[in-house]
Amino acid sequence: MKSEAIAMRHATPAWTDIARDIGDTFAARAAQHDHDGEFVAKNYADLRDRRLFSAGIPTELGGGGASHAEVCAIVRELGRHCGSTGLSYAMHSHPVCANVFKHVRGDAKATGALKKIAANEFVIAGTGANDWLASNGEAIEVDGGYRVNAHKRFVSGGPGADLFVTSAIFDGDDGPEVIHFAVPMASSGIEIQGNWDTLGMRGTGSNDIMMQDVFVPAEAVVARRPVGTWHPMWDVIVPVALPIIVSCYVGLAESAAAYALQSASGKPHQAPAIGQMQNDIAVATMALEDMIRIVDNYAFTPDLSITSDVLARKAIAARSVKSAIETASEIVGGPGFYRGHPMERIVRDMRAFHFHPLPERIQQEFSGRIALGLDPIEAR
């Protein structure tokens, strides 16, 4: 079978062409979004107008039919032009793609959700940071569902989202468990804090969100799991999500390389540094393409070993992207140290890569524990 990594290179170009066409507009806006710490709202409007938010949904459900590899290619292209837009779009796309994985296996809830997203070109935002294994917040059972109070962080794309995907802890008769659910972002009791003022990725709008007595209908709950332990659902989410997220940063590194090559024109003494930078980008690209190959357009069978392999490749890509961008910055030199130069912004945006699960040291422990036959996460 032809691998998805190879298929990505020869995919029907329509979606990446669209991303490239609007990417020039996004690049022109990027400096202002970064300077103001302002959410990329106009870019989201352009993405919606071109139905990119439903691109990864199968055509039979009303979407654009882009494969997992093609979604990664879209994100990579957006990342070349505006890191904040690429990352925000990635954070919308990965829960969509996780639902595609479930849809092709007959999950009726996932199918229904995808149809609704495609019909309305809905945008998703979910929680990040450490809000996954342990979760946070409290869900109290009430008539017809739950009442949730929580403080959620790193909600990328929140200001432009229609749906909020998150979780909370429900302490029922059988003990505490985490419930996962999606609710409209406009639900009563949801308040976006407007506190995203960061080093990099300043246009993602990844603000904190306060949930105060938010009603979650019982039918909105899509999963339940124990608190603080590894659950098989992550063996779907992690392999599907990480190649999409990594694609943004590989695109960012490719953008940095373009500025470096432009700066090094006519300077043969820069050849060794250019070669080093290209090597790092090659390593990051190989890691990304192998992640996409592993997912195989949703044909993979979830397993801890696959999750570990994908996490290892994410760590390799992160290290290589960081090295490539730092070298590119050295090649560009002093001009790239000034505010307003794209290289200065790219250097700061790259710093966000570390924070996506799992940071390298934690990944090494995770993969090492699996190799030793231990549970991937030590009980704490």
Where are these regions (language model features)?
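Glycine-rich phosphate/cofactor-binding loops in nucleotide/flavin-utilizing enzymes
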Residues: 335-380
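Basic/polar N-terminal segments that are highly enriched at the extreme N-terminus
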Residues: 1-17, 379-380
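A short core secondary-structure module
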Residues: 154-192
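C-terminal helix-coil-helix/basic helical segment that borders enzyme active sites and/or dimer interfaces
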Residues: 27, 31-35, 265, 283-316, ...
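Glycine-rich beta->alpha junctions and the first turn(s) of the following alpha-helix
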Residues: 198-282
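Glycine-rich phosphate/pyrophosphate-binding beta-alpha loops
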Residues: 153-158, 242-244, 353-356
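Glycine-rich flavin
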Residues: 39-49, 53-160
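Generic structural signal for well-ordered, non-transmembrane alpha-helical segments
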Residues: 251, 275-282, 311, 315-322, ...
